[in-house]
Curated annotation (Swiss-Prot):
A divalent metal cation 5 binds at C34, C36, C37, C50. Belongs to the metallothionein superfamily. Type 1 family. Residues 30-61 are annotated as: Alpha. Metallothioneins have a high content of cysteine residues that bind various heavy metals; these proteins are transcriptionally regulated by both heavy metals and glucocorticoids. GO terms for molecular function: copper ion binding; metal ion binding; zinc ion binding. The modification N-acetylmethionine is found at M1. The gene is Mt1. This is Metallothionein-1. A divalent metal cation 1 binds at C5, C7, C21, C24.
């Protein structure tokens, strides 16, 4: 998949472990596709890479 991961809202991303997602709005994260990582997010604990502020997170909620 494109490393920029421009998936649609509500979709799922399947980026590599060294994902450089910049526009990911997916509801189902796989590996490093979270847009951000709020404290206590179990999915982020599994390897998501923070890309933005926690208060804007929609991927790991």
């Amino acid at each position: 998949m494109d490393p920029n991961c421009s998936c649609s809202t509500g979709g799922s991303c399947t980026c590599t472990s060294s994902c450089a997602c910049k526009n990911c709005k997916c509801t189902s994260c796989k590996k490093s596709c979270c847009s951000c990582c709020p404290v206590g997010c179990s999915k982020c604990a599994q390897g998501c890479v923070c890309k933005g502020a926690a208060d804007k997170c929609t991927c790991c909620a």
